[in-house]
C-alpha cells in the first residue's frame, strides 16, 4: 500500500491491486409499499406486500383533463406547497390547508405543461362525492393525504388503473 500511495503522490503509474470480486445484491424490501389508484372506484389504496394499510376516496381529473393512467413513482413530496393564482389579475401565492392543493403534495408525473400530483384540497365536498373535477391531479381530504404522505417515500410505486 505505501508503494501505491507513493506512486500516486509522485504521479507515476502504480501497480494494480488485485482483489477478490465482490458481488453486491441490491434487493427490494420484502414488503415494499405501493399505491394503487382505481379510477373507476375513485379510491386510492396503500399496500405493503398484499396487506392493505389504508384506502381513501379521491376526486380525479375531469373527462376533458383526465388523470393519466399507467405506472408511475412518487417524484417529490412537499409540505405546505405554494399554489399560484392569477384570478384577480394579480399574482397571489396560497399555501396551507385552505389552499386549493392543501398542505401536502406528492408529484408523480411531469409533462410539457406541468406536473400531476396527489394533494389535499380546500373543497372536501368534491372528494366526498368522488367527483371527476380536477385538471388531472388526484385530490384527497387533507387528513387523508397527510396519512398517505407520512407513510410513503419518494420513489414509491404508483399504479393508476381504470
Regions found by a protein language model. Give the residues of each.
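Bacterial N-terminal signal peptides
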Residues: 2-12
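Cell wall/extracellular polymer interaction/catalysis modules
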Residues: 16-87, 95-109
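N-terminal hydrophobic or amphipathic segments with adjacent small-residue motifs
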Residues: 5, 44, 55, 64, ...
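Exported/periplasmic cell-wall-interacting domains
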Residues: 24-26, 30, 82, 88-162
Amino acid at each position: 500500500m505505501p508503494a501505491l500511495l507513493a506512486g500516486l503522490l509522485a504521479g507515476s503509474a502504480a501497480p494494480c491491486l488485485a482483489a477478490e470480486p465482490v458481488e453486491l445484491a441490491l434487493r427490494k424490501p420484502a414488503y415494499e409499499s405501493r399505491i394503487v389508484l382505481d379510477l373507476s372506484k375513485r379510491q386510492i389504496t396503500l399496500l405493503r406486500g398484499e396487506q392493505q394499510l389504508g384506502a381513501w376516496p379521491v376526486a380525479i381529473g375531469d373527462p376533458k383533463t383526465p388523470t393519466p393512467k399507467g405506472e408511475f413513482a412518487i417524484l417529490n413530496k412537499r409540505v405546505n406547497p405554494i399554489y399560484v393564482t392569477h384570478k384577480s389579475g394579480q399574482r397571489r401565492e396560497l399555501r396551507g390547508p385552505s389552499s386549493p392543493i392543501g398542505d401536502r403534495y406528492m408529484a408523480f408525473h411531469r409533462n410539457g405543461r406541468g406536473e400531476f400530483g396527489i394533494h389535499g384540497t380546500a373543497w372536501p365536498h368534491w372528494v366526498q362525492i368522488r367527483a371527476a373535477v380536477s385538471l388531472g391531479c388526484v385530490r384527497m381530504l387533507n387528513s387523508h393525504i397527510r396519512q398517505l404522505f407520512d407513510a410513503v417515500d419518494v420513489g414509491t410505486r404508483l399504479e393508476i388503473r381504470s
